[in-house]
């Protein structure tokens, strides 16, 4: 993480260093959501081969998504904290089969200018207490 937003995810850890998979890599996938009160749009953000942009995929057709929306990590997978800035939607369109929405995203962090990053370690998703009757608190 840099002050501009998410740069990538730790891919491999060694004794003295860690290898980071950049967010712009086609191999990188992060749970994401729209940061707008009237939108419940969620999807998966990741890199596009040969481009410096991101693609937000797997968004329900009915979800509210528009150009200019701010995209943040969703935190739903439990592998990343929620609400880390990813980027901004520059265009929306339907997927190749016309069933789901997709969005082009410009990354918030200028990865070409990154010199130092903050690595979040020891992240543990909030535990839920299961009450009698199966409801989580």
Go through the PLM ranges and name each one.
Residues 1-137:
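A secondary-structure micro-motif
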